[in-house]
Amino acid sequence: EEAGWVQVATSQEIGIQTGSYFLSTDKYISENTDTLAKFLQAVDESTQYINDHLDESAEYLADKLGLKAEDFKENWKNYSFEPGFSEEATTHLEDIEKWGFEHGSFPKDYNVRDFINTDVAKIAFPDNVTIE
């Protein structure tokens, strides 16, 4: 707003939710499976801590990162960490790949499922891996 921007709507208001995925090579996964599982568990624990202590976390991060605490809290409402790997997430990636191929972002069409490795997620959150 200070630069002249005016917020028209939030991502929540228009139903946009972004997803993110952790990427690695098969070699790194096979050599560091337990460490990566602990990493996923730590991300989940950190997310829960922030959810349970949002005001305190926002103030801390505002101080450390130069953010406004209220901006962090507003953005955090759009964040969710769902550990594991769901069929829904797989379908989302397939939709992205299809769109990318159809719009010339990818030189060839490929099967997303050939690149998904759930070994780590099955260790860290076995009940949350629902990819078929």
Predicted segments, located by residue:
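Short low-complexity, flexible loop/linker segments enriched in glycine and/or proline
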Residues: G4-V6, S24, I123-P126
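Short secondary-structure boundary/hinge segments and terminal tails
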Residues: Q17-T18, Y79-S80, I116-V120
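A structural motif
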Residues: T10-T18
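Secondary-structure end/capping motifs
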Residues: S30-P107
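Conserved C-terminal helix/tail region of periplasmic/extracytoplasmic solute-binding proteins
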Residues: F101-E132
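Ligand-binding "clamshell"
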Residues: E1-S11
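A bilobed periplasmic-binding-protein/Venus flytrap-type ligand-binding module shared by bacterial periplasmic
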Residues: G19-D34
